[in-house]
Structure formats: structure tokens, C-alpha cells
Design a protein with these regions (language model features):
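Preference for long, amphipathic alpha-helical scaffolds in soluble/luminal domains
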Residues: 1-495
């Protein structure tokens, strides 16, 4: 071997050893790994709004949020969804709102720059529905410009062509509480209220409080919305009280012991807002747990405070195990054993929302987070199975039972086209992405190439099998999904 080649090999070996050492140094004593899940600034901005509404802002280090937001403002004056996007309008409006709520003057140079970008992009009237919702909660937008969500939606039977279980898990856990919020249309009184009239490009007195039209078939939803609004104005909303009560019960049933809802901040914030609308007190244990759960998603350092959209210990732990073993670390080494046993403890043996559409499956999956009983997912479960398969644990029989449970659950989650989705079975009614409320186009959870590929990777890597016909169907699905350039679409990121 040439000296130059030997040097390169040594550098690679040293890099692997250093990486292994680093991974081991950040393992939690309980056995798991957990790193920050980065996001744009809307999550933290909305957390500021939540605490202002509940009056709990003085008990959190929210003054550090100002530093966090200022550090991420770009030269063009806006805040971005991804690097170099030129400034996202809705994200920038929410960051501006949060800074104003934190006491920053509208004449502050940072806000003046943000204001210029906001107005250049059309102002508040051009923002997404959820941004308008958050502004409406404190009187900075008119509820007339938001779509109606009749609470009787909660009462639609599971076998009806549309019901809450036709929404993706994240849309469902966020929307059910909003059935209460949109019905009540609250304007909460907060300490040191603000107005954002300066952010209406057309002038606040010239705003048309109407949903935008697309000029296609989806405009039928605008007509329906006009009907819902007329019914509200006449105080004729069928089964209104029953729907609100059903939504309230649904929320309470799905709160984890740790206070979480759905494992994601939007569901947690919306659930807390819904309960605020129903006059729950800040000292109620349900609310205290919910606010504490939001705190648990926060990252505080010396001069900064932000809130993650979600936490990822199960995902991080599975990948850490695989990385260590793949790089030569002994699969029966103590850190691997501890991590593997922690993962087995985290296997979810309760039925969740997935069971509504999947009557055949039995529990045995994993979720992304520490606690999320109702929403395990296929992607995490497949990665955990691969990690456990590689690890050598003292109780191999217990490990085998965990893997078998997961395999059986995953097999029952195969969708009709042949692929796998993340959280649900056959959750694919595309028309839902056309409703005015769903302007983020994320209302459903169809099968995707990346999750399907993960399942096939698991089957091959772990020498596992499913019904041959189902395997062939999944391969056919993947081949059909390949794009003309040769690539596949990655819904769940570059994974």
C-alpha cells in the first residue's frame, strides 16, 4: 500500500473512532440518544403566543426567544423555511408577531426590515390559514377571513366517506381541537396587547375578509363555507354542543401521562387552546401537564430559548445503534445492550388511532418520541427492527418477540396501491388537500416510496418475510413510483 493511501485509511479509521467516541459520550444514562430536531421559527413563535394567552409567559424564559429570533433573521429582513428561500411570508409574520408580543417596538430596525419584506410579499392577507388563525386569537386578524369548521364533523361515523380518521394523524390531532376553537372564535385578552395593522399591504380598512378562490372545482368548498357561515350567523349549527363535547372528550382521552398530545407541538398547542376556550383553568392538572409537555420540547441555552416541533429519541437511538455496529462496534457491548433494551421497553403495546382503519393489526410498533401511544409509525418501527436485529442482547427471545410483533403490525399496514404510509392505512383522499383549511396540502398520509423502501430494506436486512403476493405488490408499486429522472420522491426528507 502506498504511503498516501495508508494515510487516507488511517484518517478514515481515526474519524470512525472519534465519531464512535462522541456518540458514546452523548448517550443518556438510561440508554437512549436524543438530539435536537431543528425547525423554522414558527413553532417557537406560536409557543410565545400560547404562553401569552394562558398568562404563563412570566414563568418561562421567553425573553431569550428574542435572541433566538434575531439570530435567525436574514439580511433581506425575513425568516426562512429553508436556507436561501428569500424569506417566507407566513414565517416572517409569525416571527414579527412573537417579537411584538415580547415587547419589541415596531420601530426596531429588525422589525422595520421585516415589515418591508412582509408588505412586499402581500402582507398578512396573503399568509397561510394557520398564521391568520394565530393572529385572530389576539385580535390581529378577523375571524370572518378564516374558514368554518363545524363541530358536528366529530359525530360523522367511521364508515362514512369522510370522518376525522380520513385525515392524516398530524392533521387529525391538530384539527379536532380546532373544531372547538373555530366554533368559539375567541379573541383572548393578553397582557400588553398588540395590533399589527401596519402589516396589511392594502390597509387594514380595505381588507376583504373572504377566502381566496382558485378558479377551479375546489371553489365548491368556498360555497360550502359560505353556507356554514350563514348557519353560524343564524345560530343554526346542528349538533353543535354534542360535537364540541365529543371533541373535548377526544382531546382528554388522547393526552399522555406526560401531558403530550400526538407527539407534536401543533397538536399540543391547539389542544391547550381548545381547553382554554372551554374555560379550563391554568391550575387544572390537565393544563399543567400540557404546558409542561411544551416545556419539555424546549431547548434553553445561555442566551437562547426555542421550542422543537417534535422530539426524536426512538429514531435517534435506533440510528445510533446501527451506526456504531456498522462501523465495527461490538453488538453485545454494554452501550448497545442498554440502548436495545430501552427500545424494547418503548415498544407500544396499546391500540392507537391506526386501529380504526386497520382492524387486522395488533399492537407492536414504535413512535418517534418518548411518549406517543396513539401514533406509532411504520418508518420508525422498521428502523428499530433493523437496529434490534443487529444488536446482541442478553434476552434474545424477548428481542425476537418484539421484532415479530413489529413485523406483523407493519405487514397489516400495507396500503391498497402496494406501498406503506407513515401512520395510517389507506389514508389517501386527495380532495381533502383542496379544502380551504388545508392550504398546506398536508391533510392526508398516503403510501410513499421512501417509507415503502424502508420496509423492504428491513425485510432484506433482517431476513424477514411477508406474504409473497404482498411483497411483489410493493415492488411493483416502487417501480411505478420511480420518476423519469430515475429518482424517487422522498416525502419524509432525505432518508
Amino acid at each position: 500500500m502506498e504511503t498516501q493511501d495508508r494515510t487516507k485509511v488511517n484518517k478514515v479509521v481515526d474519524a470512525i473512532a472519534a465519531s464512535q467516541k462522541h456518540l458514546l459520550s452523548i448517550q443518556n444514562p438510561d440508554g437512549y440518544w436524543w438530539a435536537e430536531l431543528e425547525s423554522n421559527v414558527t413553532i417557537t413563535s406560536e409557543a410565545v403566543l400560547l404562553h401569552k394567552i394562558w398568562g404563563t409567559d412570566k414563568t418561562r424564559p421567553l425573553h431569550k426567544v428574542e435572541n433566538y429570533l434575531r439570530s435567525l433573521q436574514r439580511e433581506h429582513g425575513g425568516w426562512e423555511l429553508f436556507f436561501g428561500d428569500g424569506g417566507d411570508l407566513s414565517t416572517t409574520v409569525e416571527a414579527y408577531m412573537a417579537l411584538r408580543l415580547l415587547g419589541v417596538s415596531p420601530t426596531d430596525p429588525a422589525l422595520l426590515k421585516a415589515k418591508s419584506l412582509i408588505l412586499a410579499k402581500g402582507g398578512i392577507s396573503k399568509t397561510r390559514i394557520f398564521t391568520k388563525l394565530h393572529l385572530a386569537l389576539i385580535g390581529c386578524y378577523n375571524w370572518r377571513g378564516l374558514p368554518s369548521l363545524p363541530p358536528w364533523v366529530m359525530l360523522l361515523p367511521d364508515n362514512f366517506f369522510f370522518n376525522i380518521y380520513e385525515l392524516s394523524s398530524w392533521a387529525r390531532s391538530s384539527t379536532v381541537p380546532l373544531l372547538i376553537v373555530f366554533d368559539q372564535k375567541p379573541v383572548f385578552k393578553i397582557d400588553q396587547p398588540i395590533n399589527l395593522d401596519e402589516l396589511y399591504a392594502e390597509g387594514v380598512n380595505n381588507v376583504r375578509w373572504k377566502l381566496p378562490k382558485n378558479g377551479d372545482w375546489s371553489d365548491i368548498f368556498n360555497i360550502l363555507d359560505d353556507g356554514f357561515k350563514l348557519a353560524e350567523s343564524l345560530n343554526f349549527v346542528p349538533f353543535r354542543n354534542e360535537g364540541i363535547k365529543a371533541a373535548e372528550n377526544w382531546i382528554l382521552e388522547r393526552q399522555e401521562v406526560t401531558g403530550d398530545w400526538g407527539g407534536i407541538i401543533p397538536a399540543m398547542l391547539n389542544s391547550l387552546l381548545a381547553l382554554k376556550c372551554l374555560d379550563y383553568d391554568a391550575n387544572d392538572p390537565i393544563i399543567e401537564r400540557g404546558l409542561k409537555a411544551v416545556d419539555n420540547f424546549a431547548i434553553e441555552i445561555e442566551n437562547s430559548y426555542c421550542v422543537q416541533p417534535c422530539v426524536s429519541p426512538v429514531w435517534d437511538t435506533a440510528w445510533a445503534i446501527r451506526a456504531l455496529i456498522d462501523s465495527g462496534f461490538a453488538p453485545n457491548n454494554a452501550p448497545i445492550v442498554k440502548a436495545g433494551e430501552w427500545l424494547i421497553e418503548k415498544q407500544i403495546l396499546d391500540y392507537g388511532d391506526w386501529n380504526v382503519k386497520n382492524k387486522q393489526g395488533k399492537p407492536g410498533a414504535w413512535a418517534f418520541e418518548f411518549e406517543n401511544r396513539f401514533y406509532p409509525d411504520v418508518d420508525d418501527s422498521a428502523v428499530v427492527v433493523m437496529a434490534l436485529y443487529q444488536a446482541k442482547l442478553p434476552n434474545e427471545e424477548l428481542k425476537k418477540q418484539a421484532i415479530d410483533r413489529a413485523l406483523n403490525w407493519i405487514a397489516t399496514m400495507q396500503c391498497k396501491p402496494g406501498g406503506w404510509a407513515a401512520f395510517d392505512l389507506n389514508n389517501d383522499q386527495e380532495w381533502l388537500n383542496a379544502v380551504p383549511y388545508g392550504d398546506l396540502k398536508a391533510m392526508i398520509d398516503p403510501n410513499t416510496a421512501d417509507v415503502t423502501a424502508r420496509v423492504l430494506e428491513m425485510l432484506g436486512a433482517c431476513n424477514l418475510s411477508i406474504q409473497p403476493n404482498n411483497l411483489e405488490k410493493s415492488l411493483d408499486y416502487l417501480l411505478k413510483e420511480q420518476e423519469t429522472e430515475g429518482c424517487w420522491f422522498g416525502r419524509w426528507g432525505v432518508n
